[in-house]
Amino acid sequence: MELYIVRHGETLWNKEKRCQGTIDISLNENGRELARITGEALKDVHFDKIYSSPLSRAYETACLIKGDRDIPVIKDDRLKEVCFGNMEGMCMDDMLKDPDSHFQHFFDAPHLYVPDENGESLEALCERTKGFLVNELMPEADSL
């Protein structure tokens, strides 16, 4: 099995350096163009299926990469971005400067990252995505 992992295209919040997490922000025009370019680069690659987060930025990216090929695009909640809870929508630069913020730990010391009361722990994120890998990909894999 060959597995291609592609990140979604750019959104307005990416450009503004805002924390997105599970808030459903659509692609901007540059993000759509980047997804089309990626689709063009992958046009000769055979895909049996495309899996996507149900968030519109990821699903739209997947559909633009697929183009007019007859390939199912399957939405799966387990592929959503990590939930940053109350930090979603906030300016990342501000959070990274705040010495009391756990946000920086997410990137440089994940073992110290503590989500807020509405956020998702890295352990929960790993369990969620592991469930996707084990249940969806491993049964079909010769080896992964």
Name the predicted role of every residue range.
Residues N14-K15, V82-M87, Y113-E117:
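A short acidic, helix-capping loop that chelates divalent metal ions and anchors anionic groups
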Residues I37-F103:
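Phosphate-coordination/substrate-recognition cap region in phosphate-metabolizing enzymes
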